[in-house]
Structure formats: C-alpha cells, structure tokens
C-alpha cells in the first residue's frame, strides 16, 4: 500500500509524492529531507562525478524516462480504478487524478533538500533492493487517497491517526516541508516510475538511505533548523561516515491490523524477565511486526538500534516485507567497517503485506500503541536496567546452540553489532548485568570476546547468538493512546557497583546502611536520648525497682496481690501468652509466671523493711519496748524465716510448671488396645512440647551447650512424664487410678486392655509413694527439676563439667527445702534419703516403658497404633541408645 507521510503525522498526499510503508516515527520526514538521493541507474552513477551537485544528478534522472512513464502520464485523466498490487507486491492505493503538468528540474536551494521517492522493496534473501516486474494487466492510474479510503483496508489506522495528531503534531514544520516536497519530488517520482516500467536493474546502493552516504550542507542546515524547532539537541547531528551505524530513535508506532511476519522463538530469559519492559499482553507490537531477515543473522529488533541476533531458518526467497530505513541518529555512532555496517544495520522493520496470500490478520487493537522514551535517558541510572530487563539476562541469551566467538558463521558476524552509543574505550562505570560465565561465555563471566561488559551496565553480546522459532511476548510498557507510566525500578544486578567514598560503608545495593566511618566522629545515641527504663514484665515505662525487679506500677500491684493471695491462676492457652503493655491483663497466670522469672519476690520488700526497722531500733533513745512492738518484731522474724524457707528458685519452679494437658481421647467409644495406645502416644507428644518449654525456662538450663540441652530432654522425657503423672494421680484420685489426663484415666480394666498392666502397676505404686512419704508441692517441683539432670550418655556431654555443677546446685536446693521445715539434722538426712530413693525408683519404670514403646513402634503397623511424627523420631533414634546401654541414668544409691 502507499501511505502519505508528513513530518510527524499522516497528511494528504502531495500531487506526486507517495511513500510505501507504515508511519514510522517523528523523524521519518527529516530523514527523507537530509539524506541525499543517488543516481537511479548504474550508468548514471558512473557518469556523475563524486563532487557533482544534487541538481546535476537530478537532471540526469529527468532525462531517463521510459515509454511506461509516458503512458502513465497520458492515462492520468482516466477514471479511478480499484486497488491493486503494485510492482513490489504490496497493495497500492491509486493516486488522485492530477492534471498533466510540464516536468521541470527542481531547484535545490541551500535551505532545502531534494527529496526523492523511496526505493523499491528489499529482498529478504540478500538484503538488497530489487525491482520486481509488474504484471502486464496492471497500470498505475490514480485514485483518491484520503484517510477515509484507508479505513476499510486498515481498520485501526483511522483511530491511530487521531492519537498521533494529538501526540506528534508539527503542523507548521509540515507545511514547510510539504511545499518543498511538491517542488522537488515530481521529477524523481516520474523517473522512478520509468525505471520500474522498463525493469532496469537497480544499484546495490539504491536503498532508502539514498545512493550516497553523505549528507549535504544544505540538508544538514535544514536538519538543524528542524531539530531546534522541535526542541532537540543539534550537537549530535554530525556527518555520518559510510561505515557508521545509525542509532534508531525511540518513538514509533506499528500499523494495526497488519498480518505479522515470520517470528522466531524468543530466547528463554525474555519471557522470564521479572518486572521488565516485556509482557504477555494480547496486543502484539514491535516484536510481532519486525522483519525476520536471514541475511542479518536472525531476528532484528530495533528498540535501541540493537540486534539480538537470534538466528532463524527462513528461506532466502521468502521475503515480502518492506525494510524501512533507520531514523536520524541523536548520538554519533562509532565507526565500523562499511560492509559489516551495511549488513548489520538495525532498522525498524514493519511489513505491510506479504507476497502471496497473507495469513489471517490478528484482531485489531482499539488504540494505537505508542512507545514513548527519551533517548537521552540512556545516560541515566536506570538505563542499564531497562536494557537488561528488555532482553533478559544476557548470559542466558547465549544458548546451548550458540556459535562460539570464533565460529565465523554469517550469523555470528552479523549479530556482533551492539548499541554503538557506548564504545569499548570508555571505562567500566557499572558492574556487569547478570553473571555467570560458563559454557561459551556469559554476559559477565565469560571471555572478553563472548561477553564484554560495556559501560553503564550494557553487556555486549557474544558472537553468534542462537534462538528458536516461536513468538515474542509483547512488551510490558506499551501504553495505549500515549499514556506513560512510571519507569520501573532498576534490576539489582545492574545497579552501579562502584560508589563514591561516602557510599563505601553501605550494604546491599548501596552498601551497609550504617555509617561505620562516621561513628568515630559522633557521640553515642545515648548521649542525646538517655535509655528509657522499661518494665521487665510488660515493657511499659518502669517506675522503679519493686520486689527485686525493675517493673512498672501496674505489675508491682499485680504481683503483690497475686503472690499474697491464695487464688491459683490457670492459663486458658498453653502458658505462652504474650504479656505486653496492652495485653498484660489478659492472662494473670502467664503474667505471674513472668514476674517470678524476672526475680520478683515478696521477701525482697520485707528484707528492705527489716533493714529500715534495724535503723530505727539503733536510733531509738529508750531501750524499753511495748508489748505491741514486741509482737510486731516476732511477726517480722517469722516472716523472714518463712522467706528463707521459700527461696526465689522455688518461686520460679512454681511459675513455670506446665498446666493441664488433655489427650483428646473419645471416652464414648469402647476401649480397645489401639485406641488407648494411640491416645497415649498423642498425649505423649503434647506433653513433650510442654516439657521442652518447661526445661528452657529452668534456671541455668540455657547455659548448657545446645547439643547437651537437646540430649538431656530426649533422654529424660519419659521419666519426667511418669513422675508428673504419679503426682497427678496422687493429688486428683488419691493414687487409686492412673491420671494420665483429665480425659484419659486408667482404671484396672484399661490397664489390662492396654496390654501394659505390669508397667501400670509400677506407675501406680510410684503414685502411692507420694502419699506414703507425704511429698509436699515444693519437694515435688525440686525433685522433678533434678530428675531432668539424672540421665546422660556414658561418654559424657560436650560440657560435662558445667552439667555436673548445675546438677549439684539443684541437689543443694532440694536439701535446702528439706532443711527449711525440719530443725533436726538427723530428720533432714532421713528425708533426703527418702526423696532420693524415690527418684531412683523412677528410672527402672522409665526403662520398661522405653522397651514397651520401642516394641510397639516396630509392630505399630500390625496393631494399628498411631505414633505422632516427633514421638516416632525420638523413640526410633534415642530410645535404642538407652536400651543398648550407651545412655545410663545417674543413681543416688547403689542398685
């Protein structure tokens, strides 16, 4: 098709000026003006001297008309005809009927540039322009070319033009160039039609960039004037040598409703780039319409004038696409070899139609998709990340089938071109994007030839990137109607890695976020903000030291009432409630436990009162005392003696004692071996969790080695549970039954049904010992804590010395509790003997239960007994060590 192009938008076509191609970008008409057309025939090129002016070359073109051109001029007064295919295989819109005018050579003024008609189509097999012969039954009669005629053929073009007019309106500049085009193009277009009719061969240099590669002074002046009027910089608009590669601009819009060309498979990281500029939207854009040219070494995509170089396998003669030239470069490119630069130019390729029957077109998008970028932004900090995310990790782009740096394949040579904005002479300012060199050289870890790191994070691709056939995903930041969103954040791998001295002490992308170097020059933070005293219980602001701990007034009053009162608190949860400023009143049990753990005790306040009382007694002048004072002193002494019998250690043991744990047994079901044993195993795992929490809260336990802590718990858990169950049976059912849990109480029938009657009898006997010896709750708590440190491996623990010291301290605490109630040393020794004998009796019972549970675990699949995961692991790993003799209990008396 033939679409009229003005500067920055679609305008009504001048009398004889047509352009075959889609609307490209803002700089399309500028390129048409500044680039010098070459001779239309080889003989004309040879006849014209190198320094010939534009007027002489165009006069030669004027004289080379053909009979076909004369027939076209004579047949312009005919009626309009339907659309047809032109000589290049594209759908042609007939020109408007124009009166025949005498052809005259256009005058090339210094302020103007002579604009020729674009050349013929480019063959995909060779990448060179070639003229296709037109069918004999076709003619070039004109037809109206208004935008209304474009609507039926291209459904999205009418809506696209409205958006383009709003975004890219340059009416004043268009009028100036339109007048120049009407004067300068008529002769070139007529000579072009003559050559098309005659079928004369075209020169290899006869492409859209013109026959020559130089830019005249007049065209350069006009380019600068247009650039200044559009607010662009003119310092980069210099002469481009024949080998220099033009950098593509960053603003373009594809024609909608056009069937896509052959598209190769994208490289793997393109679809996986997170937060990149690519997405999977339904509306395909540049990647869908870019030309696949085997001559260039694969899929060419001109987002920033870069070539992915993904090699394809299309046939050489399967070209029906129209290759459009690159636009005006805003940056001066580095010089390359002329032949290599000609083959690897990265144009914006948008096929209008394919030779032959076209494939079904995709559904048209309701809006034009315009990509808006500022070319100057490539010097910013996020430019490297944008390029890296657009093409994915460059290291992974070098696929398994890629040719090596020295392969010498055509695709390898052609795909070596990269973004020429950054040269190899510039220093490396940013770290490499993505790393990993292996297998052929990645983007940052391979050889310098395969993946040289350019400044600003751009990584030059290795030679011969290979791709697969498939579809590219649509870009992510394509905004319909010209909407521009916020620029995505840069990738962490593309952030500048070399910072200034002030950033040396930051971590992460910017170093350690603490100014280590400035710590020597500033005062500590405590100098400006004194540390606030907080309550050890709830974290509120502390008012002072109350009852031996730094607490607030609320926790002080709570502890006084809870400790002096006889009410016993129970936690509704698992004795692990959160106690803070806002939730300290939710659970008084956990709050009181935390008070004891912090070291609060009523004796501390009484000792303080005793000290004040002694001072008062020393200061009294008279030595006489009243009966009331004597009574008060006796009460004080009795309270002090009571405090000495109830040390802080005992208060902590009372606070951390676990609560009641239920087994979850269904008592409505008939008792069976599998049901009873499964419930016992479930209860064992629940209690094991509480044992671990209780052990960690014991004074001095956390000072053990971590491995020793785990070993002590895994070896003593059975004895602790048996001892606690005996105490519950004594206090709840007077040792007549085994009180495992409130919902799991074993009577004689259940003892027999569980097939562990002998073990149950020994456990019941242990429970009866509590009654016979009249064990107090304080003695039980201290004995239970001492039982935790009564079984160790034969080889010893990692910190055996500290374990022995801790165990000895608990033995002394037990002796102190015994001595608190008895004044006779003989009675204390007898009591100590009884209690230690009771502790020794727990170990044989625990060993029998170890053997029973281990045998049951082995046969569990046969008897349908469920073992929880943690219980099964401990029984299968730790119990065999006890049964084999590698772990032995510590006895107080000889067995």
Swiss-Prot record:
Q: What is one cellular component GO term in this UniProt entry?
A: nucleoplasm
Q: Where is this region: Interaction with ZNF318?
A: 1-562
* Pfam families assigned: Androgen_recep, Hormone_recep, zf-C4
Residue ranges constituting the NR LBD domain according to the UniProt record: 644-875
Q: Where is the composition biased (Polar residues)?
A: 201-211
Q: Where is this region: Interaction with LPXN?
A: 527-894
Q: Where is this region: Disordered?
A: 33-155, 175-211
Q: Which residues carry this modification: Phosphotyrosine?
A: 208, 252, 292, 331, 342, 347-348, 378, 510, 527, 891
In terms of SMART domains, this protein maps to:
HOLI, ZnF_C4
What are the boundaries of the region Interaction with KAT7?
600-894
Biological process annotations from GO:
androgen receptor signaling pathway; intracellular receptor signaling pathway; negative regulation of extrinsic apoptotic signaling pathway; positive regulation of cell population proliferation; positive regulation of gene expression; positive regulation of transcription by RNA polymerase II; regulation of protein localization to plasma membrane
Residues noted as binding 17beta-hydroxy-5alpha-androstan-3-one in the record, renumbered to the chain: 681, 728, 853
| Subunit details | Binds DNA as a homodimer. Part of a ternary complex containing AR, EFCAB6/DJBP and PARK7. Interacts with HIPK3 and NR0B2 in the presence of androgen. The ligand binding domain interacts with KAT7/HBO1 in the presence of dihydrotestosterone. Interacts with EFCAB6/DJBP, PQBP1, RANBP9, RBAK, SPDEF, SRA1, TGFB1I1 and RREB1. Interacts with ZMIZ1/ZIMP10 and ZMIZ2/ZMIP7 which both enhance its transactivation activity. Interacts with SLC30A9 and RAD54L2/ARIP4. Interacts with MACROD1 (via macro domain).
Q: What is this protein called?
A: Androgen receptor
Q: What organism does the UniProt record list as the source?
A: Papio hamadryas (Hamadryas baboon)
Q: Which gene encodes it?
A: AR
């Amino acid at each position: 098709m033939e679409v009229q192009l003005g500067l920055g938008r679609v305008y009504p076509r001048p009398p004889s000026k047509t352009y075959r191609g889609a609307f490209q970008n803002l700089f399309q008409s500028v390129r048409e003006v500044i680039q010098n057309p070459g001779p239309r025939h080889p003989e004309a090129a040879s006849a014209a001297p190198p320094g010939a002016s534009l007027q002489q070359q165009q006069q030669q073109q004027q004289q080379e008309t053909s009979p076909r051109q004369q027939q076209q001029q004579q047949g312009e007064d005919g009626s309009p005809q339907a659309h047809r295919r032109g000589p290049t295989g594209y759908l042609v819109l007939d020109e408007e009927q124009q009166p025949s005018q005498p052809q005259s050579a256009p005058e090339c003024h210094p302020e103007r540039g002579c604009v020729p008609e674009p050349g013929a189509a480019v063959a995909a097999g060779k990448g060179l322009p070639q003229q296709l012969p037109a069918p004999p039954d076709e003619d070039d009669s004109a037809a109206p070319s208004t935008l209304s005629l474009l609507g039926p053929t291209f459904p999205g073009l009418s809506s696209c033009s409205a958006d383009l007019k709003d975004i890219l309106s340059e009416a004043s500049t268009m009028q100036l160039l339109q007048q120049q085009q009407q004067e300068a193009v008529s002769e070139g277009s007529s000579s072009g039609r003559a050559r098309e009719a005659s079928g004369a061969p075209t020169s290899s240099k006869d492409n859209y960039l013109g026959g020559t590669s130089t830019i005249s002074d007049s065209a350069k002046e006009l380019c600068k004037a247009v650039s200044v009027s559009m607010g662009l910089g003119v310092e980069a608009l210099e002469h481009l040598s024949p080998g220099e590669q033009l950098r593509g601009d960053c603003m373009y819009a594809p024609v909608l409703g056009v069937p896509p060309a052959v598209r190769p498979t994208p490289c793997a990281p393109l679809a996986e780039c997170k937060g990149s500029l690519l997405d999977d939207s339904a509306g395909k854009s540049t990647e869908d319409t870019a030309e696949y040219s085997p001559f260039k070494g694969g899929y060419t995509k001109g987002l920033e004038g870069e070539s992915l170089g993904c090699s394809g396998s299309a046939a050489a003669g399967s070209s029906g696409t129209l290759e459009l030239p690159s636009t005006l470069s805003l940056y001066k490119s580095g010089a390359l070899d002329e032949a290599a630069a000609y083959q690897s130019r990265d144009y914006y390729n948008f096929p209008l139609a394919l030779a032959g029957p076209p494939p079904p077109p995709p559904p048209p998008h309701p809006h034009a998709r315009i990509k808006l970028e500022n070319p100057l932004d490539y010097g910013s900090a996020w430019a490297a990340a944008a390029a890296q995310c657009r093409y994915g990790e460059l290291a992974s782009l070098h696929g398994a089938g890629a040719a090596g740096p020295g392969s010498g394949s055509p695709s390898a040579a052609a795909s070596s071109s990269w973004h020429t904005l950054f040269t190899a002479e510039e220093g490396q300012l940013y770290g490499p994007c993505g790393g990993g060199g292996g297998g052929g050289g990645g983007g940052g870890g391979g050889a310098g030839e395969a993946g040289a790191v350019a400044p600003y994070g751009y990584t030059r691709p290795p030679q011969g990137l290979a791709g697969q056939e498939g579809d590219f995903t649509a870009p992510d930041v394509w905004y319909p109607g010209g909407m521009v969103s916020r620029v995505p954040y840069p990738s962490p791998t593309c952030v500048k890695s070399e910072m200034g001295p002030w950033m040396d002490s930051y971590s992460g992308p910017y170093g350690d976020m603490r100014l280590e170097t400035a710590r020597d020059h500033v005062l500590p933070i405590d100098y400006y903000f004194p540390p606030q005293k907080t309550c050890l219980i709830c974290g509120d602001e502390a008012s002072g030291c109350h009852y031996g701990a730094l607490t607030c007034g609320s926790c002080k009053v709570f502890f006084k009432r809870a400790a002096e009162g006889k009410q016993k608190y129970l936690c509704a949860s698992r004795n692990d409630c959160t106690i803070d400023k806002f939730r300290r009143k939710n659970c008084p049990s956990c709050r009181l436990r935390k008070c004891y753990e912090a070291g609060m005790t009523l004796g501390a306040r009484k000792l303080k009162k005793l000290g004040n009382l002694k001072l008062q007694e020393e200061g009294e002048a008279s030595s006489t005392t009243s009966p009331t004072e004597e009574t008060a002193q006796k009460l004080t002494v009795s309270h002090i003696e009571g405090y000495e019998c109830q040390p802080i250690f005992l208060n902590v043991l009372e606070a951390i004692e676990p609560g009641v744990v239920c087994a979850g047994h269904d008592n409505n079901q008939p008792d069976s071996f599998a049901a009873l044993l499964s419930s016992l195993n479930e209860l064992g795992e629940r209690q094991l969790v509480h044992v671990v929490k209780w052990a960690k809260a014991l004074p001095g336990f956390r000072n053990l080695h971590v491995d020793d802590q785990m070993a002590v718990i895994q070896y003593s858990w059975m004895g602790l549970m048996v001892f606690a169950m005996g105490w519950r049976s004594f206090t709840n059912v007077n040792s007549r039954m085994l009180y495992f849990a409130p919902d799991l109480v074993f009577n004689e029938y259940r003892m027999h049904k569980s097939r562990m009657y002998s073990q149950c009898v020994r456990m019941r006997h242990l429970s009866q010992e509590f009654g016979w010896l009249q064990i107090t709750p304080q003695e039980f708590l201290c004995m239970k804590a001492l039982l935790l440190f009564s079984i160790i491996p034969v080889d010893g623990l990692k910190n055996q010395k500290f374990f022995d010291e801790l165990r000895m301290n608990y033995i002394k605490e037990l002796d102190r509790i015994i001595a608190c109630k008895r004044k006779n040393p003989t009675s204390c020794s007898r009591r100590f003997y009884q209690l230690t004998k009771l502790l020794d009796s727990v170990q044989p019972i625990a060993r029998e239960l170890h053997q029973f549970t281990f045998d049951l675990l082995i046969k569990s699949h046969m008897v349908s007994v469920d073992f929880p995961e943690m219980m099964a692991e401990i029984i299968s790993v730790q119990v065999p060590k006890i049964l084999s003799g590698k772990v032995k209990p510590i006895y107080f008396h000889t067995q």
